[in-house]
Amino acid sequence: MEKRRVVITGLGTVNPLGNNTADSWAAARAGKCGIGPITQFDTSEFKCKLAGEVKGFDPETVVDKKEARKMARFTLLALGAAAEAIQDSGIDCEAEAENIGVIVSSGIGGLPTIEEQHSRGEEKGMEKVSPYFVPMAIANMAAAQIAIRFGLKGMCTCPVTACAGGTNAVGDAFHRIRDGYEPVMVCGGAESCISPLGIGGFTSMKALS
């Protein structure tokens, strides 16, 4: 089989330097740093007090408030980046739905959601855990929600390979296109693990400075 040439036609990002590619690139060129004091929880009892937090991202730019409440933050960040990449590519998702696949990784998935719902269960009883807990927490939900949101009907999967996940997803997407399985792939990675349990765990394994 002849190998297809693979090109990148659209870019999208939500990260500590900016909530889109233009702002991120401008900040990087200006030498700005996305690392700063953690603001999402009290770090007074933690050795590590710094992280790269996404600031000012409005999930309602991609989903309505009701739907956003049913999704973990990593999924919302992935949707924001995917929306920009799809728009940047100029592809017609409705016309090309059968030809577009999704490979989006997450190493931990909805870790803050797991913490929140565990605390809720401990305080109010486990029967009070949200019915959306499982679909919010599982790592493949970013890829799934992108496919659902944009009506994409090609392959949809999530490699869970820790810090290499995003690169893994891009590599897998490259092979899917090159080898003729799908003409188009939406690919990348999303993470949101700046939480007491996440920072505590990475600190204990001495992976943070």
What are these regions (language model features)?
Residues 1-108, 112-155, 175-178, 194, ...:
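Conserved "HGTGT" condensation-loop signature of ketosynthase/thiolase-family condensing enzymes
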Residues 156-160:
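Short catalytic-loop micro-motif centered on adjacent basic/acidic residues
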Residues 166:
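Short conserved active-site loop signatures built around small residues
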Residues 169:
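Active-site histidine-anchored catalytic micro-motif
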Residues 172:
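Internal active-site segments that recognize and position negatively charged phosphoryl groups
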Residues 181-185:
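Short, high-confidence coil segments that cap the C-terminus of an alpha-helix
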Residues 188:
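Conserved residues at the C-terminal ends of beta-strands
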Residues 191:
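Catalytic metal-binding/acid-base residues of hydrolase active sites
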